Amino acid sequence: MAATMMNKTVVLSKGCTKPSAVPKVSINRKGFLNTAMNKKREMMVWQPFNNKMFETFSYLPPLTDEQISKQVDYILANSWTPCLEFAASDQAYAGNENCIRMGPVASTYQDNRYWTMWKLPMFGCTDGSQVLSEIQACTKAFPDAYIRLVCFDANRQVQISGFLVHRPPSATDYRLPADRQV
């Protein structure tokens, strides 16, 4: 299918049979296509330096207590086992200095680093307030550490999710999405 605009032919897509499926295309004075993507900066380049992220939700601002509570409720509603882990700022991100390697291969843990577990996994936990009180206790004991909540599925024997519940006050790694782009 081709569209003729300003005496120029633009090939759209060969498989389109419905006119409604064809995107609106026009050519500006300089001869470039005007599409929705070109009108806004849809295709952005992310800053490759100091743009570290942790697992689920790491692209968002730090979660509030209410948002964490909703996530805990979701974890418990699915009968998953919550577990708290913490790590010092210099050990939180994967790197050659803090990864466990066995010869030329890395360990079998998902991201090659181990965080210290806070107590034991909360097997049989049915009340979200128990998890929230453990988060508060861990934060009080280690205020300058990263703390994440992970959950495990006992049936599939896998880690289902993991997300930060506390960033140290001294952390400078989080950047707003607008600041991550070039």
From Swiss-Prot:
Gene Ontology, cellular component aspect: chloroplast
Gene Ontology molecular function: any one: ribulose-bisphosphate carboxylase activity
Protein name (Swiss-Prot/TrEMBL): Ribulose bisphosphate carboxylase small subunit, chloroplastic 4
Keyword Chloroplast: yes
Subunit structure: Heterohexadecamer of 8 large and 8 small subunits.
PANTHER family xrefs: RIBULOSE BISPHOSPHATE CARBOXYLASE SMALL CHAIN 1, CHLOROPLASTIC, RIBULOSE BISPHOSPHATE CARBOXYLASE SMALL SUBUNIT, CHLOROPLASTIC 1
UniProt keywords, alphabetically: Calvin cycle, Carbon dioxide fixation, Chloroplast, Photorespiration, Photosynthesis, Plastid, Transit peptide
Membrane-crossing residue ranges in chain numbering: none
Function text: RuBisCO catalyzes two reactions: the carboxylation of D-ribulose 1,5-bisphosphate, the primary event in carbon dioxide fixation, as well as the oxidative fragmentation of the pentose substrate. Both reactions occur simultaneously and in competition at the same active site. Although the small subunit is not catalytic it is essential for maximal activity.
InterPro entries, per database record: RuBisCO_ssu, RuBisCO_ssu_dom, RuBisCO_ssu_sf
Species for this entry: Acetabularia peniculus (Green alga)
Lineage: Eukaryota, Viridiplantae, Chlorophyta, Ulvophyceae, TCBD clade
Family note: Belongs to the RuBisCO small chain family.
Gene field: RBCS4
Any one biological process term the GO annotation gives: photorespiration
